[in-house]
Design a protein with these regions (language model features):
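Active-site gating loops and adjacent loop-to-helix segments of metal-dependent hydrolytic enzymes
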Residues: 72-104, 149-166, 226-248, 268-271, ...
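Alpha-helical scaffold segments that flank or form the walls of functional sites
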Residues: 74-143, 168-182, 430-435, 441
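Active-site microenvironment of metallo-dependent hydrolases
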Residues: 1-22, 26-32, 37, 43, ...
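Metal-coordinating catalytic core of metallo-dependent amide/deamination hydrolases
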Residues: 134-262
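Divalent metal-coordination and catalytic microenvironments
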Residues: 7, 24, 29, 54, ...
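His/Asp/Glu-enriched, well-ordered alpha-helical/loop segment
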Residues: 241-248, 293-382, 395
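Histidine/acidic-residue-rich catalytic or RNA/ligand-binding cores of hydrolases
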Residues: 226-236, 261-267, 283-295, 310-329
């Protein structure tokens, strides 16, 4: 039993309660009590008491769209690579030579970054090959995750990526059986690549597979960039006609939408993963075209995604929240658009809802899983603490995260990762990254030459 007492607690519960002097009592993997400190009474002596008088406590953040494997080559791609050359010239060669060890260490690196910045649950975008090996790495970290394998039915490209429709569906079925048998924090979903790479049969089959296993399914790239409208803007009306739009569907990016599209998302209960950092860097036209405020206004579940090591280049949810809270205010010339309270919901309870976990995570409530983030108030961005939500969204970054609890376990304790040897991961990543680039036949580019 762990008691965090006398903290500023942002619950994101049904009443959106915030306590200036609050406590959270954790018993095993679940929250036993949460409320004003004067009302939280442990039934026995806690195993540990954490003084929260200089802490801010929030629910763990939920990142609904991450490419784990690309963390191994973070920073490799310069920011002036044309969007239509990004995948074929750079990512495909890297993925073609990706080993299980590469994927594991990329996952460890990405996971450490997420933990250190307050993310406790994530959904991989669907770009893994050895999902079992990656699941082992995620379990070592102690994170909650949904994983997906590389899924399309193209018969061109590198040998390991060629898949018929039947092969793609069979591989996903095997993954769901494997991860489902683990009965732990890691689960699997069918997650399709997008980019016009998936047939109707594959999309229908993925949805049927998800329904059969009682999980969600998703498409990685949809309506994401103006230059790809003819390739990846599969009309939502078509997906609807195929019967695949449903509450267990999660679509990513979704920049180019009209009113009819939004109405269809509302009607079908489809979930959206919005990736602000990658969207801006890849010039997707967020400020000019994205309908995020309108989706939120009309009741679409919109969550946040960090995307990739060369897309956003980081997985700091606080930086994503800051962008979302500001981009659309300026775009609409309206300071009332997406207030900090709404953005915090997007990073917590809406993320949980997008991953079909809202009954288990996303808020600090009795009976829910104990996923908590403890921020250190002794940092300049937290002072003075007049409005905790304003400080959280507009001032803080992940650097002030002090401790993180996932499923009742402190995976970050007073600034120290407790589950893996952090330095050993960093050292091995340096070796693997350079070897992967060499095997892919790519060149590391630096506009300012990196001299010996």
């Amino acid at each position: 039993m762990i008691l965090v007492e006398h903290a500023t607690v942002i619950t994101v519960d049904g009443e959106r309660r915030v306590f200036a002097d609050g406590s959270v009592l954790v018993d095993g993997s679940r929250i036993l009590q949460v409320g004003p400190s004067r009302e939280v009474h442990p039934p026995r002596e806690p195993d540990r008491v954490i003084d929260g008088s200089r802490l801010v406590v929030t629910p763990g953040f939920v990142d609904t769209h991450v490419h784990l494997s690309e963390h191994l080559n973070r920073g490799l791609l310069l920011d002036d690579i044309p969007v239509d050359r990004y995948l074929p010239d750079w990512l495909i060669p890297l993925y073609a030579v990706m080993t299980a060890e590469d994927e594991q260490h990329a996952a460890l690196l990405a996971g450490i970054e997420m933990i250190r910045t307050g993310t406790t649950t994530f959904c991989e975008a669907g770009t893994l090959f050895d999902t079992s090996a990656v699941a082992d790495a995620v379990e070592r970290l102690g994170m909650r995750a949904i994983l997906g394998r590389w899924t399309w039915d193209l018969e061109s490209g590198p040998d390991r990526m060629r898949q018929t429709t039947a092969e793609a569906l069979a591989a996903n079925a095997a993954m769901l059986e494997d991860l489902g048998a683990r009965d732990g924090l890691v689960r699997g979903w069918p997650l399709l690549l997008g980019f016009g790479t998936c047939s109707e049969e594959l999309i229908r089959g993925a949805k049927a597979l998800a329904d059969r296993h009682g999980v969600g399914w998703g498409m990685m790239h949809l309506a994401s960039h103006p230059s790809r409208r003819t390739r990846d803007r599969l009309p939502l009306a078509t997906l609807d006609a195929w019967g695949v739009l449903a509450p267990n569907a999660k679509l990513s990016h979704m920049v180019y939408l009209d009113d009819a599209d939004i109405a269809r998302l509302v009607r079908r209960g489809v979930k959206i993963s919005h990736c602000p950092t990658a969207g801006l860097k890849h010039t997707k036209g967020l400020a000019a075209h994205a309908r995020v405020p309108e989706m939120v206004r009309d009741g679409v579940c919109v969550s946040l995604g960090g995307d990739s090591g060369n897309g956003s280049n980081h997985f700091d949810m606080l930086r994503m929240m800051y962008l979302v809270a500001n981009i659309y205010k300026d775009a609409r010339l309206d300071v009332r658009v997406l207030p900090p309270e709404t953005v915090v919901e997007m990073a917590t309870i809406r993320g949980a809802e997008a991953l079909l976990m809202e009954r288990e995570i996303g808020s600090l409530e009795v009976g829910k899983r104990a996923d908590l983030v403890l921020f250190d108030r002794d940092a300049p961005e937290w002072r003075p603490l007049l409005n905790p939500l304003n400080n959280l969204v507009y001032a803080a970054t992940g650097s002030s995260v002090r401790s993180v609890m996932i499923d009742g376990r402190l995976v970050l304790d007073e600034g120290r990762i407790t589950t893996v040897d952090e330095r050993a991961v960093y050292d091995r990543v340096e070796v693997l990254a350079r070897d992967q680039v060499r095997r892919a036949g790519l060149t590391v580019l630096n506009r300012w030459p990196l001299r010996p």
